[in-house]
Amino acid sequence: MGGPNAGFTSLAAALDYLQSHPKETVWAMNWDAPSRPLDRQINENLVLLVLAGPDCKTERAPLAWLGYPSTKQTADFDAKKGEPPRLVQAWTAAIEDAAAKANRQDTDIGYLIHDAGNTHQDSSARLGALAQTLTVQLPEFDFLKQSFNLTAVLGETGAGTALTNVALGIAYAHHFGKPVLVAGTSDLSAPVALVVAPPAVARPIRPDQPWFRARGGNHAYLPWWGLRHDAPEYYQGFSQ
């Protein structure tokens, strides 16, 4: 998986490493500046995930739990009368598999973060197939209210897309306590799904309290670690 899905490839390799080194940590990173040579564009970004193995003594509560990304090839499905399009079948299988890899049911999914965009030549096909899939797979899911379209806001983010959406999924699961589906829609022949599971204790956003990262430019770039077990207090959006 490359292009906007490159981060999923890096993340899968990182999770593979932790499977064989459960007491260690690994970094997964993606970045891109698709508008280069223009600079200071909102679609240039970098995300670094510091992942801990299940037996790593971090002395911190997890922000969230990540399942493996799952991808399915549309060519592996048949186009038949009375059946949904092959892309929808591939999405259905990928989402079910991704949920299982996160030890969840697909019906547990409470939010969607995706990269279908709204100006790309394939945006309509991306959105249509994903929306059709979730409408059938999760009948109570409100696609408009329960989703965030990253590239509709920032523009095409290139190789910086996948892990940016995973990071947003971590934040949503952490604060709202619901599993999040991260969908990689850019390859219409091979959709990618990943489920982020929430921690045991969610930390709801308190709108009446300060948000640490809004205090200044330097604070915005500080790492967001899991809350230390010995932390005397909790700052929204930050832990030492």
Residue ranges and their predicted role:
Residues M1-G2, A98-L130, Q137-L138:
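Conserved beta-ketoacyl condensing-enzyme motif
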Residues N5-S10, A33-L38, R86, G117-D122, ...:
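Short acidic, S/G/P-rich loop/turn micro-motifs used as interaction or catalytic elements
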Residues V182-R206:
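A contiguous, mid-protein "functional segment" used to position or interact
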Residues P34, L38-D97, A197-Q240:
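Condensing-enzyme catalytic core mediating Claisen C-C bond formation in acyl metabolism
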Residues T25-M29, K178-A183:
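Cysteine-clustered segments with highest specificity for TGF-beta superfamily mature ligands
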Residues E156-A162, G169-I170, H174-V182, L188-S189:
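Membrane-proximal bilayer-interacting regions
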Residues M1-P22, W27-M29, A129-T164:
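Conserved catalytic cysteine-centered active-site region
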Residues L11-A12, P84-A98, D122-L134, L163-A167:
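Well-ordered, non-membrane alpha-helical segments in soluble/globular domains
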